[in-house]
Amino acid sequence: MGWGGQEIRILTEARGFLDRGHRVVLYATPGSRIAAEAPGYGVPLVTLPIGRKRPAGVAALARALKAARHDVVNTHSSTDSWLAAVAVRMLRDPPVLVRTRHVSVPVPNDPGTRWLYRKATARVVTTGEALRLQLVRDNGLDPARVESIPTGIDASAYAALPQDEARRLVGLPLDVPIVGIVATLRSWKGHRHLVDSLTKVSTPHTMLAIVGDGPQREVLERHVDAQGLVGRVRFAGQQRDVAPWLGALDVFALPSTANEGVPQALLQAMFAGVPCVTTAAGAIPEIARDGETALVVPPADPAALASAIDRLLADRALGTRLASAARAYVTPRFGLATMLDRMDKAFRRAIEDAKR
């Protein structure tokens, strides 16, 4: 498991349930990034050999679950879902399984996967309605057992910060337009298209801030160099607190091409009041409505992306209107407390269903 919105949600959700008085344990692979980050969130951690689908991992997880006597096991990826599904069948009084699915990559329809989703798992939670509909339509899941619970954002962490102050905090210049992205550096997040769009943006001296790290970093750095943009692109790396980076931006861009639920970073930007440019990948349209809460462009289209960025940089009133509408839309629907309330209900429904 790497590090991105999925892992941040896992730890934030765990911390939230701990604060509400629940007993929570994170099971993770030794040496994994999420295991390293868990203490910073105050989340109890048990490391197990569960990085691969192997009998040793099943046995270790079964022993841990037997000792802990949990009510619910919430899995988040293919590997942990398979290991947990087998492990609980080794227990006399097993916990129920709830699977959270974070991406819109198609789920296979082979017999094993059908068993995992339809029989072994009590409930499935998705991070966007588009993902829920996909599982019902393409995989035949019972609609009553699948629900969309997008990631919740702590609004207090994204209170408006004066732009000049934010730029001083993160070391960005005060006198140039700055476009930014917060995302793990994966190919489908669209970083390359955003870099290419910078060569087409007509607003003078526009800079790009790339916040995040990941497998595409070296590739992107070479591409930035090849495009002659080294002086105009800032690679900020992974940042625990992205609020000042968002506060420093004139425009937030997330040009994803695939796989998205409701992206956590796009929600953060909207809570922070930053005008947004994005695409209609995955469940993004659930919060990004073109001309209402964001500007939405076709995926993999640097020219369209550049045009939208120029439009927001030139028309600050438009940016203010979109940002205000976006914040008004997401605040009552995508807050942290809302997510925790809905996940609590999902877990309780799973437990009740298992008793029938």
Segments predicted by a language model, with ranges:
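Membrane-interface segments of envelope glycosyltransferases acting on lipid-linked substrates or membrane lipids
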Residues: 1-356
